[in-house]
Curated annotation (Swiss-Prot):
The gene is SPP2. It is found in: Nucleus. Residues 10-26 have a biased composition (Basic residues). GO terms for cellular component: spliceosomal complex. Involved in spliceosome maturation and the first step of pre-mRNA splicing. The keyword Nucleus applies. Keywords: mRNA processing, mRNA splicing, Nucleus, Spliceosome. Residues 1-28, 54-156 are annotated as: Disordered. PANTHER family: G PATCH AND KOW-CONTAINING, G-PATCH DOMAIN AND KOW MOTIFS-CONTAINING PROTEIN. Transmembrane segments: none annotated. It comes from Kluyveromyces lactis (strain ATCC 8585 / CBS 2359 / DSM 70799 / NBRC 1267 / NRRL Y-1140 / WM37). This is Pre-mRNA-splicing factor SPP2.
Length: 189
């Protein structure tokens, strides 16, 4: 039998002394208080605490925002005049080619009249919609003579899953079926 044996008994027997002595407790520096050798401590370096300046975590835009250009200062605000002043960029300095709402009004298409809706036949709209989704009207007319049966309409063999093909092994299983029978085992077998 293999195994490991560990003895929990200590080999050294501790003899108790009749006199009591106080144990030396180490100080912060790891030296006992009663130790006469270490009487002076020299500190060679002192770490200076550096205060970190907290910067705001925001991204300032390079150009003033359009909303701040149009904003009017409130009369009861306590900001100085320097903080309220907004510098408007010159037209040559502006990176944006913004001409205002009049440029947007020129690009709006004309409103469609009811007469134009009546000109488009409903059948034409339906075929256009189907062509946009990939329908080919010429392919439908050619294949109308040959009507193909869909996969779910075709008969398939019993006990065979979807997409599985019937093999000769599965045919032989149907003809020669032997059910499982439980047999009692005895000690002699």
């Amino acid at each position: 039998m293999n195994g490991i044996s560990i003895s929990l008994k200590s080999k050294n027997k501790v003899k108790k002394k009749s006199g009591t002595k106080k144990k030396k407790k180490p100080t912060v520096f790891g030296i006992a208080d009663n130790d006469e050798k270490a009487t002076e401590f020299k500190i060679t370096s002192v770490e200076e605490r550096k205060e970190t300046i907290k910067k705001p975590l925001c991204i300032t835009p390079t150009e003033p925002l359009r909303s701040s250009l149009n904003a009017r200062p409130e009369s009861g605000s306590l900001k100085s005049e320097d903080e309220q002043a907004v510098v408007f960029p010159e037209e040559s300095e502006s990176k944006f080619d913004f001409k205002g709402p009049s440029a947007l009004r020129n690009n709006i298409p004309e409103k469609t009249n009811e007469e134009e809706y009546e000109e488009v036949p409903v059948e034409g709209f339906g075929t256009a919609l189907l062509r946009g989704m990939g329908w080919d009207p010429s392919a439908e007319n050619d294949s109308s003579s040959e009507k193909s049966t869909l996969l779910h309409e075709k008969p398939h063999p019993e006990l065979v899953g979807i997409g599985a093909k019937l093999t000769t092994a599965s045919n032989s299983l149907r003809t020669a079926f032997m059910p499982l029978i439980r047999r009692k085992k005895t000690a002699n077998e």
